[in-house]
Amino acid sequence: RSLAKKAKILLLDEPLVNLDYKLREDLRDVFKNLFDSDLSTESILIYASTDPQEAMQLNGDIVVIDEGRVLQTGPAKEVFENPANIKVAEITNDPAMNILPGIIDDKEIIFNEDFKLNLPSHLSHLDSGKYFFGVRATDLKLDNSGFNFTVDISEISGSETFLHMHQDELKVVLMIEEVRNFNLDDQVKISMDMNRLYVFDANGDLIFSPYRGN
């Protein structure tokens, strides 16, 4: 009714949460059109969601809130590409961005004794020391020449497969764009796209984004 009346202030608190998948998809398009229509100039529309994919699809200005504290504001694309800190990176990705503690030392990124990478040239300006490295599930891939990980969970979602894996204390999630079957404790080799690697400082604040540099 508020939408029909073009109310000046619209507060939509997870309006699609109890709907089936197809109806949610259809109504997301409706709400996205609202952001792009005259309604956006006439009214203030606040859409609350705990679904990061939904927030990104609506493509408006977003406010990332955690435990009542505003962490970052801005256009959805800007926040997604340049999360201010680790918490924002985790909240705005589904599954959450993989965050790996590591050390830069002697032109290497060292996660542990069995997982070391050559420091890419675009990160050569970073000083030696402790950092957190972020990589999305979509930027990890199965690679026979990669590093060994052990499968903890294989989760099929629609036409995609999510592999939850570990190597010693490191835990990551990898997305495969097809249905694949894996068993508990399967050994797989993976690599990461170094051109999509984020770097956060010891306090968890962003210091390098692949979309804008440092």
Where are these regions (language model features)?
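Non-catalytic connector elements of ABC transporters
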Residues: M97, E108-N214
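ABC ATPase nucleotide-binding domains
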Residues: R1-K87
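C-terminal boundary and immediately downstream tail of ABC-type ATPase nucleotide-binding domains
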Residues: E81-D105, D193
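Conserved coupling/switch loops of ABC nucleotide-binding domains, chiefly the family-specific signature
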Residues: E67, P101, L197
